Amino acid sequence: MDSIKNRIMKEYEDLQKHKEENTVTVWMVDNNIRHWKGKIKGPIDTCYQGGIFVIDILIPDEYPFKPPKMKFDTKIWHPNISSVTGAICLDILKNEWTPALTIRTALISLQALMCEPVPDDPQDAVVAKQYMSDIKLFNETAKHWVEEYANPERNFQKKIKELTDMGFTEQQARDALEKNNEDVEKAINYLVGA
């Protein structure tokens, strides 16, 4: 059991060490070694460029012999990702997982999937149908979703407004959000001293 925890911590530390050079970053949820959030940048020259996508990562007790459970928290228009639940259809998160793979590998594979959708093996049939029948409309829709849901500045401004509507100053809201990984609930607890 300790060797599994050591592996998980090593993977986490490796991602932290290289987060500036990576287009993927991770953090633990409530210091839970088995529950992380990941952020991946929308790949350049794709309809996802400019977006920041948050991934929920649950690491099972059987890790690394079983894959991490991942889903998109950020809404995304993609044939292999549910536009409703964020569930992902990716072989390495299912039957192609091997213990030699890492969470970083899985996150980079998600980024690659954003570059090269596989509409023949969809998670979201409606999106896949649009992708195959009208790629121009698909790209326009995906870009709209990036602007609406994966735009970090726009989302940050919404969070600031939510806190200022509660009576906090804009600076208090910014500081609290920055200290709490932009989690509004934690920022509120921080601001009220809970």
Question: What is each model feature region?
Answer:
Residues M1-I88, I92-L101:
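Strand-helix-loop interaction patch of compact alpha/beta domains
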